[in-house]
Amino acid sequence: MSAANDGAAPAASAAPGMSAAPEWSAAERATLRAAFRAGRLPHALLIHEAPGAGGEWLATWAAQLVLCREPARAPCGACTGCRRVWALQHPDVTWLRATEESRQIRIEQVRDLAAELALTAHGGGYKVGIVSPADALNRFAANALLKTLEEPPPGTLLVLTATQPSRLPATLISRCQRLRVRAPTRAEGIAWLTALRGTGEWGEALEVLGDAPLLLARAEPREIAQTGLDARRTLDALAEGTADPVAEAERWARGEALPLRLRCFENWLTDQIRRRTPSPTPITEVRAGPYLPAGGVVLNIRELFGLLDEVRELRATLDVPLNRGLALEALFRRLTRQGAPS
């Protein structure tokens, strides 16, 4: 396995739970397997996943599919090829990830990937490049990757994963076959986690993480559930005007749970928007404007969307030096002024 990431290998969590196949992506796996056996597998795939739904899992599975040493059963999951892909040690698989410094995939990394894919495969078969998340490609890196997609070396498979494919250039998307990995139902997530790790407080943890079971493949569900409950209570109190924005911002900014709390904040806002939309319209299609909820308080949906965008931006910039307490205080003050009674 090689990694075009400034010499750093991809994290060991790149494909958690390979031993338990997510049932909600069974159709996508069947499509890829049929195409491979018929000799019609495209040279590039774009996996559009709901967050934590298993895009990287499917990308790793696709690498196993083409590198399995038992073609009749590919991917068998037991041969040397499959096990090395799973362990992130296969010499013909290159992972492309965002650098820790910039949280972007840079043009130098894409050039390294192109050079690696141009080499002869160690096993005489496929060379695989996995770009995850592809929506971390900066503009220059995306343009460089487009050249590889337009003229791929023979015997290569490029797999891109993205939760926000709209951030990718349309020309890049057009060179890929798209697969959609939907978010699992709560029951599907619980069943998968139970098969993988045994019984646990999976339902409560999935509620906190927004039904993203792959994020729980190695996490402790009880701690996540407790953090989520505390976050929801805090946000409810802020919306009702019974909590101090300054004190709560200082408390949230301390410790290592801030990324999880911000995810809870994002899920809480998403839920508030859905509950205040008078029809089951997808959240991406909700029109901004006031809506009268059951509590009789006119809420501005535009303001809630604005808060949601800022929470997502704060989550994406946690590695950037800034005063997180002040950023949280500004968000909490807006929430208190807005009000969002249940």
Regions of interest found by a model, annotated:
Residues M1-L65, R73, G81-R84, P154-L157, ...:
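Charged, glycine-rich active-site and insertion segments that engage polyanionic ligands
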Residues P75-I105, S166:
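AAA+/P-loop NTPase substrate/partner-engagement loops
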Residues H90, V110, A142, I173, ...:
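ATP/adenylate-binding site constellation spanning eukaryotic-like Ser/Thr protein kinases
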Residues A30-F36, R106-V128, A136, F140-T148:
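Conserved alpha-helical scaffold flanking the Walker A/P-loop in AAA+ ATPase domains
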Residues G129-S132, L145, T156-A162:
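Structural recognition of the conserved hydrophobic beta-strand(s) that form the central parallel beta-sheet
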Residues T99-I107, A134, R178:
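Flexible beta-alpha connector loops of hexameric P-loop NTPases
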Residues R40-L41, W86-P91, H122-G125, P152-G155:
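Short loop/turn elements that form and flank the Walker-type P-loop nucleotide-binding site
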